[in-house]
Amino acid sequence: VELHDARRKRRWTVDLEPFEIGATSVTTAQYAQLMGTSETGSQEPVVDINWLEAIVFCNAASINEGLVPAYIIDAGEVTWQTNASGYRLPTEAEWEYACRAGTTGPHYGPLDAIGWTANDKVEKPKEVGQKLPNAFGLHDTLGNVWEWCWDLLDPARYGEYRIFRGGGFADKSWSVRASTRRGGAPGMSHPDLGLRMARGVFDDAQAAQGWSADADSERGKITGMLPSGWTPRRY
């Protein structure tokens, strides 16, 4: 899959190993069942969930099914055990590959038919799976809610910000594209931001599916003037 970072004017290709990914975003019912929240649960995507909460949910889903949790969480620091069988957040390369399902344009079909956006004039996320799926059978990868990914957005500019992808129900149609990248602090939540889980086992503990711990570390060491025009970092 080819990725594109418009801010840095950078394109790169990632060769992916086989992986699994959810057909829909995680629903409020699924979240409530595992996490014991007070909500009764519905088929709407769970939202207002930050990145760290998404990580905790993935581990809970793994434990519930007798799988090895993908994440070690220690005092707020998260380590991905790439050789674990459990559920996890997709890397952004996995997410974009899954979203595109073999297509190369901004959408995998007519946007009004595949995703909920501002064009639909809805006031909250809709139940999952109501619009047409892509060729892989995945629903709502574009529109309805953004979905957290594992990767850092850009350590040089945004520190610990994590990527989210896909676009939400309130976003204008021009911004809801398979290549659009956004991000936020791990503790940030939003009414149109949820998650979709993935699975896959890999040999390299420091790099997998387009993510590299070494690359993040090197990028994070960059100092000095950064390009103007970027979205300010929020603390």
Predicted features by range, described:
Residues A70-A75, A207-S217:
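Short, flexible loop/turn segments with low-complexity composition
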Residues W211-Y235:
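Short, cationic low-complexity segments
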Residues P191-A207, G224:
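Short, structured beta-strand segments at or near domain termini in extracellular proteins/domains
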Residues E20-G22, C149, R196-A198:
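Residues within well-ordered beta-strands of beta-sheet-rich folds
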Residues V1-S62, G143, V201:
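A short glycine-rich, aromatic-capped structural motif
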Residues T40, W51-R182, P186, P191:
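Functional-site microenvironments in short loops/helix caps that host divalent-cation chemistry
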Residues D5-K9, N83, P155-Y158, D204-A207:
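Short, solvent-exposed loop/turn segments that connect beta-strands within catalytic domains
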Residues E2-R7, T28-Q30, E96-Y97, K172-S175, ...:
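Short, solvent-exposed loop/turn elements at domain surfaces
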